[in-house]
A protein has these predicted regions:
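Accessory beta-strand-rich segments of carbohydrate-active enzymes
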Residues: 2, 9, 39-43, 71, ...
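Predominantly extracellular/luminal regions of secreted and cell-surface proteins
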Residues: 35-58
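Short coil/turn motif common to extracellular beta-sandwich-like domains
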Residues: 113-116, 218-226
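N-terminal pre-domain segments of enzymes
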Residues: 1-31
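Substrate-binding/catalytic cleft of secreted carbohydrate-active enzymes
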Residues: 383-616
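Active-site-adjacent substrate/metal-binding segments within catalytic domains
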Residues: 65-86, 115-121, 126-132, 138, ...
Length: 618
């Protein structure tokens, strides 16, 4: 496979790697980025090596070119990470204040008698154990979700040792894996492992805000907010007037990565009488209702966000929400339609799998993520289906502020897939409208009880972590039967976790008749739909036309759903298929998702090439 690089990978500043504030929904003034060079080693035994193999650039996986390692972690191996950090004399700043070296209150000070220190991992694939100064802090399983540990008692003044051990079974286990495969090819791609999102430290008061959840209710002109903490405390919430976060601001001091702090990449929250809606008081762990008059609704053209700050004891965080509502409603012809703020919205989407040739699961920079999302809108898409992957929170923040609707897939897992069944046979069954119950765990690769329980746990946590993002309109539970089980039960669980959003319970085939969508995949046949009385008709995958460009393709072999010999041929087929989609709108079609945004390895059916340097579809 030929190694390709994006322009962001080619110009990567290795002293400032993905240093933007990683949690835009809840911004705190204390932030120490631990991205950068770490020691690494591969071992056969679960024993920390005395000597390491070299340096790895975190948060890029060892399989990614930007990591500097270029080596696959195998299921019978362990990957070890090591670095040091200091909690003395580090400068910090509030997310909405200017930087000041003279501030005596700033810094990751070693005196933590009245403060706590939290260690955050954006994602580590697949299972890991963490030590600080030789003390085991905790472990985590699941390669797609963030987690954190309190490390206060393990930290000492001066230099501290941080060690992470990783095990990744990839597609040889039932754990969530997405499109990763040790033997890549076709629609499955290079397996990656280890730390793949930002690692960071956060200093918090002893009594601190653990979580802020918002529930906007635009029809009632109010928002409900709950501030969660370990006990009951008084809280103060200052709500700002809505605005659109068009311009990003980055105020980072000229310090090396290990000494720097960052702020949320957005306009700072200002508290003046001209910009403030009001100040509201309540208690932690109780819902507080706040009236919002003259509501500015979030839309794709006007993505208004409401900034706010929360104060509790000595703690203070900043966040945002949006006033918007996704519903199913019937139009004048009786067709069920997807509506945004009670207005019919045809969701013209594109499938995005979040792979990069130089970073694999990790975008080379924040600017690279922004490029993809801005170009999607310029290409006429108002929706993106995030396929079998969970992105860093900043990706969803950019969708929020740019006005790009998101369908979020749950990440698939399970045993070894029977592709003859879930691909070829299922395609024909879908065309002939043969409905199969999801009770055949062997055919659908869900025999392990542990795997089923883990899927439910991760589905709930995915919703919990992401439901604050207004851009997310729909959850997709299962894709093409991969690891599918108890679909109606999963739909009920998900509906209870988040009644605010729409649900695609089975994208492609093995539809059990529930959820909000009749969700079809069609790559080979004439496009047609069969509108239903209660569910919206969506074409959740189609297209996939392949066109390989020499010098911008990673593989000589190509994969797709119709080979085109040139750009003109590709665009002719694309326009013809899109015209067929357009004609179905009057027959009840509510949304469509073109496959796909960019080429990935052998699968050269992207709007863009894998390196994002050439747009193939005009």
């Amino acid at each position: 496979m030929e190694q390709l690089f994006t322009v962001w990978g080619e110009t990567l500043d290795k002293e400032h790697v993905l240093d933007e504030y990683p949690r835009p929904l809840m911004v705190r003034d204390s932030y120490l980025n631990l991205n950068g060079y770490w020691d690494y080693a591969f071992t056969q035994e679960f024993v920390c090596p005395k000597e390491f193999d070299g340096k790895i650039l975190v948060p890029f996986s060892p399989e990614a070119a930007l990591s500097g390692v270029n080596r696959q972690l195998m299921p019978d191996e362990y990957l070890w990470y090591h670095r040091t950090f200091s909690v003395d004399g580090h400068k910090t700043k509030r997310a909405d204040e200017s930087f000041s070296e003279e501030d005596p209150e700033s810094g990751m000070g070693a005196d933590l008698t009245e403060e706590r220190l939290l260690l955050h991992f954006g994602a580590v694939d697949q299972a890991c154990v963490v030590w600080v100064n030789g003390q085991r802090i905790g472990k985590h399983t699941g390669g797609y979700l963030p987690f954190e540990f309190e490390i206060t008692e393990a930290v000492q003044a001066g230099e501290n040792d941080l060690v992470v051990a990783v095990k990744d079974l990839s597609d040889t286990s039932y754990h969530s894996r997405g499109k990763q495969k040790l033997e890549r090819g076709g629609m499955f791609y290079t397996a990656q492992s280890g730390i793949c999102q930002t690692v960071w430290l956060e200093r918090v008061p002893e009594k601190y805000i653990k979580e802020v959840e918002t529930l906007p209710e635009p029809d009632e002109e109010k928002v409900r907010i709950i501030v969660r903490s370990g006990a009951e405390y008084a809280v103060k919430i200052v709500l700002q007037k809505p605005k659109i976060h068009k311009e990003l601001k980055k105020n980072v001091p000229d310090d090396p990565v290990e000494d720097m702090t960052g702020s949320r990449i957005a306009d700072p929250v200002e508290s003046t009488t001209e910009t403030t809606i009001g100040t509201f008081y309540g208690k932690t762990n109780e819902w507080l209702e706040i009236p919002v008059q003259d509501v500015q609704m979030w839309t794709c053209d006007t993505p208004y966000l409401y900034d706010f700050t929360v104060e509790m004891e000595k703690d203070r965080v900043a966040g945002y929400f949006a006033m918007r509502k996704f519903t199913l409603e019937k139009d004048g012809q009786g067709f069920v339609r997807i509506c945004l703020n009670h207005q019919v919205q045809y969701q013209n989407g594109v499938l995005d799998q979040g792979y990069w040739p130089d970073g694999l699961y990790t975008a080379p920079s924040d600017e690279a993520m922004i490029f993809d999302l801005e170009q999607m809108k310029k290409c006429g898409f108002n929706m993106v289906r995030k396929h079998l992957k969970i992105e860093p929170q900043r990706w969803y923040y950019h969708c929020d502020r740019l006005g790009l609707v998101v369908w979020q897939d749950m990440v698939n897992g399970g045993g070894k897939y029977k592709h003859w069944f879930v691909t070829y046979a299922a395609t024909l069954m879908s065309w002939w409208k043969i409905r199969m119950r999801d009770i055949y765990s062997g055919l659908l690769a869900r025999k392990e009880k542990e795997g089923r329980l883990e899927f439910v746990k991760e589905m709930k946590e995915t919703v919990h972590r992401l439901k604050g993002h207004p851009s997310i309109a729909a959850w997709v539970i299962f894709n093409e039967g991969w690891g599918q089980f108890q679909t109606e039960d999963m739909t009920a669980i998900l509906r209870k976790e988040d009644p605010d959003r729409l649900i695609d319970q089975a994208s492609g085939w093995f539809d059990q008749g529930g959820g909000d969508f009749c969700s079809l995949h069609n790559y080979f046949f004439k496009l047609k739909i069969h509108p239903e009385k209660e569910r919206a008709s969506v074409l959740s995958e189609f297209g996939g036309y392949s066109y390989r460009i020499e010098g911008h393709s990673a593989c000589g072999k190509l994969y797709g759903y119709g080979i085109c010999r040139g750009k003109k041929a590709l665009n002719r087929r694309y326009r013809k298929r899109m015209e067929q989609v357009k004609n179905l709108i009057d027959e009840g079609l509510c949304a469509s998702v073109y496959t796909q945004w960019s080429d990935i390895e052998e699968e050269v059916n992207g709007v863009y090439t894998y390196d994002r340097k050439i747009r193939k579809i005009d």
